Regions:
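Short low-complexity, flexible loop/linker segments enriched in glycine and/or proline
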Residues: 114-120
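Short, glycine-/Ser/Thr-/acidic-enriched flexible segments
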Residues: 38-39, 107, 146
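Conserved PLP cofactor-binding pocket of PLP-dependent enzymes
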Residues: 93-114
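Short acidic-hydrophobic surface loop/beta-edge motif
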Residues: 22-26, 120-126
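Generic alpha-helical structural context detector
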Residues: 2, 42-46, 106, 139
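Substrate-binding/catalytic subdomain of NAD(P)-dependent oxidoreductase enzymes
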Residues: 1-11, 105
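Flexible, small-/acidic-enriched active-site or ligand-binding loops
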Residues: 124-162
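Aromatic-enriched alpha-helical interface/lid elements that frame and gate functional surfaces
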Residues: 15, 19-95, 99, 161
Length: 162
């Protein structure tokens, strides 16, 4: 917002453009991995059970990894396809590598953290056959969740337009 530049869309790839970061297919879905620096890359190789990758001249140093990115990426894809995303999430977390299964909205909202943070608020509106959920703000004020308490005033807002 204050840097004077607008980032370009990067799709599923990490902003760092590191070949060992970004979205990887697993047996059952996507896994986001952020192994952007040498320390994280070494931890990634250890977590994958593939310390031999570090001995390959194509990938030993960061500039070499960048130069040989397609080959490294292909090797990592082959490895990640061998297990489910949640298993990789656990293994890489233990290795100290930032990584997480890409969850659907339903999966995300079912996480204990989402309930603790009260990411949604249940509302009742007599025009709806059942209660519905709306998002709250991502923070609390004086320990309280900030959430809408009444439905939007649609009729009032649209009345001037017919």
């Amino acid at each position: 917002l204050t840097g004077g530049w607008t980032p370009r869309p990067s799709g599923n790839e990490a902003w760092s453009q590191s070949p060992s970061s970004g979205a990887f297919e697993t047996q059952d879905g996507l896994l986001m991995v952020a192994a952007n620096n040498d320390k994280q890359f070494r931890a990634l190789c250890a977590g994958l059970g593939r310390p031999d990758i570090l001995e390959d001249a194509r990938w030993k140093e960061a500039p070499c990894r960048a130069k040989n990115a397609p080959e490294l990426r292909a090797e990592l894809v082959r490895i990640f396809l061998s297990r489910p995303a949640l298993e990789w999430e656990r293994v890489l977390d233990e290795a100290g590598v930032p990584a997480a299964k890409v969850r659907s909205l339903d999966e995300t909202l079912a996480e204990p953290h989402a309930a603790t943070r009260a990411f949604t608020h249940t509302m009742h509106w007599d025009r709806q056959p059942h209660d519905f959920h709306v998002p709250t703000l991502g923070f609390k004020v004086d320990g309280e969740v900030i959430a809408p308490t009444t439905p939007p005033p649609a009729n009032q807002a649209l009345k001037p337009y017919g």
